[in-house]
Amino acid sequence: MDPMNSWESRQAAKLALCTVIRVIMQPMWKKAECEALPSQEEAPRELHTIGTPGCNTIEAVCEYLHAPIEKSVKAVALTSDKGGLILCFVRGDHEVNEIKVTNAVGANEVMMASDEQIRAAGTVPGFMGPIGLDLNKCTILIDATVMNMHNVCCGANEVDTHYVDAEPCRDFVYTKVLDIRTAHEGDQCPHCKGHLKEARGIEVGQVFKLYTKYSEALHATFLDPE
């Protein structure tokens, strides 16, 4: 009997194929593109501020205002190896995808910004919002889903203060509007218009772009050009 046609060989081949698929899927899912989610049309209301004492997380704000988290916009402040502050805004129940942000700004990596960097841009940690900021002091990336929202709450760039009834298309300032959120199962693919499906995988290896981070720290440098 041909050993290549044995049951064991066929099972091994299936296992190898599944392993390859899983390894490929894991990093692909991290940066999977997704369509902006639609939002129910609403009549715009007048923008105003409201005091939110001690509410420096989107969950605390929504609880204080008795508002659904899907009607809020949250901020994530990042910086990159190129320097500069990057303020990212997504719907309150979504997560910023750092891989998408890295690609959007043409950087090698992004990391969390410091409180000092945030204040230098004219805003306040825990109360950041995309209204009234100077685009010369920061890059503002807004997820495409946010621009379909209406009458939302967001930070007012003042301590213990938030905006309510903000209209993103009317009130927000930004550098770019694009897909920067982490995709989830059921989201629509922007290419085939099908719906994404998530599957559990096993990561057996990964390549990290470390550049000179560790070599410089360990003084592992060349003594001369040769």
Task: Locate each region found by the language model.
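Extended, low-hydrophobicity, polar/charged segments
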Residues: M1-E226
